[in-house]
Amino acid sequence: MIEADRLISAGTTLPEDGADRAIRPKLLEEYVGQPQVRSQMEIFIKAAKLRGDALDHLLIFGPPGLGKTTLANIVANEMGVNLRTTSGPVLEKAGDLAAMLTNLEPHDVLFIDEIHRLSPVVEEVLYPAMEDYQLDIMIGEGPAARSIKIDLPPFTLIGATTRAGSLTSPLRDRFGIVQRLEFYQVPDLQYIVSRSARFMGLEMSDDGALEVARRARGTPRIANRLLRRVRDFAEVKHDGTISADIAAQALDMLNVDAEGFDYMDRKLLLAVIDKFFGGPVGLDNLAAAIGEERETIEDVLEPYLIQQGFLQRTPRGRMATTRAWNHFGITPPEMP
């Protein structure tokens, strides 16, 4: 199954997701959830502004859809500087990165999404830029080649990744601030859904927002995507007002169940239960059983299932928990 086909995928960006930019928080005081990250960043930003320094380099990691790009925008807004945005796969050559770095103004923020996908050549250029605000460039070729150093203005690099373990140690060690974004709690998601509904001009009850939040897998991007589909249902099937009952009907129609699981989540859990007797099962076998790539299972499907206690990752493989068996109304086997 193609990941983009999943309504509750947080790892893909649909064209309509551009509308989310208008409802994204611009400042820390508008930022909902992630209380530890918010309080720490408030201190770090205030301290940097008091000293008149650029904010230290920041690494943000966590599952997709939790607001890494939003946080980068907030940092730039709070610091009162420009934000330059790119991604690891786009920076194919050292010259691509050099061009971006030399165009930065003092204290500007350079945001690199999917930073774990930087090529080794580009990453080498980044080391002196991060550490010494210098760019080492080779001029010429062969025996006549020489290296020149270009001074860069103090800047902040913000790197975002869903796979912090894939970063090389030299790159990871150069970030002075490291923040992990966690799945959102339902009350925070309910607030986000209500706020988005107001921006979209929708009439939505608190219970309606709660119903969407409960099924959003702890992820704001999914919450906003579900809200738009619920809006469509409410406008076509009813008078446009979104109550808890209308939201539940819409989400049931979309095959998003009360736990926020869709077809792929249920397929994975049922494969572990039915085909492998609850596990343990190795990742490669599980990927073959459900027709998915192992990276998709690791990065997209598993994190939420593990965090919610439906799947367990053990040294011997993946295992379905008692909660997973109960979710499908199947009696779990007795422990030996």
UniProtKB/Swiss-Prot annotation:
Listed GO MF terms: ATP binding; ATP hydrolysis activity; four-way junction DNA binding; four-way junction helicase activity
Name the reaction it catalyses.
Answer: ATP + H2O = ADP + phosphate + H(+)
Is Acetylation a UniProt keyword of this protein?
A: no
In short, the EC number is: 3.6.4.-
Q: What class of enzyme is it?
A: hydrolase
Region (Large ATPase domain (RuvB-L)) residue spans: 4-184
Top-level division of the source organism's lineage: Bacteria
Stretch list, region Small ATPAse domain (RuvB-S): 185-255
What InterPro entries does the record point to?
Answer: AAA+_ATPase, AAA_lid_4, DNA_helicase_Holl-junc_RuvB, P-loop_NTPase, RuvB-like_N, RuvB_C, WH-like_DNA-bd_sf, WH_DNA-bd_sf
Binding, Mg(2+): 69
Task: Please name the GO terms of the biological process aspect recorded for this protein, alphabetically.
Answer: DNA recombination; DNA repair
Q: What is known of its domains?
A: Has 3 domains, the large (RuvB-L) and small ATPase (RuvB-S) domains and the C-terminal head (RuvB-H) domain. The head domain binds DNA, while the ATPase domains jointly bind ATP, ADP or are empty depending on the state of the subunit in the translocation cycle. During a single DNA translocation step the structure of each domain remains the same, but their relative positions change.
**Family classification:** Belongs to the RuvB family.
Q: What does this protein do?
A: The RuvA-RuvB-RuvC complex processes Holliday junction (HJ) DNA during genetic recombination and DNA repair, while the RuvA-RuvB complex plays an important role in the rescue of blocked DNA replication forks via replication fork reversal (RFR). RuvA specifically binds to HJ cruciform DNA, conferring on it an open structure. The RuvB hexamer acts as an ATP-dependent pump, pulling dsDNA into and through the RuvAB complex. RuvB forms 2 homohexamers on either side of HJ DNA bound by 1 or 2 RuvA tetramers; 4 subunits per hexamer contact DNA at a time.
- Name under which the protein is recorded: Holliday junction branch migration complex subunit RuvB
Which species is this record about? Answer: Shigella sonnei (strain Ss046)
Q: Which gene encodes it?
A: ruvB
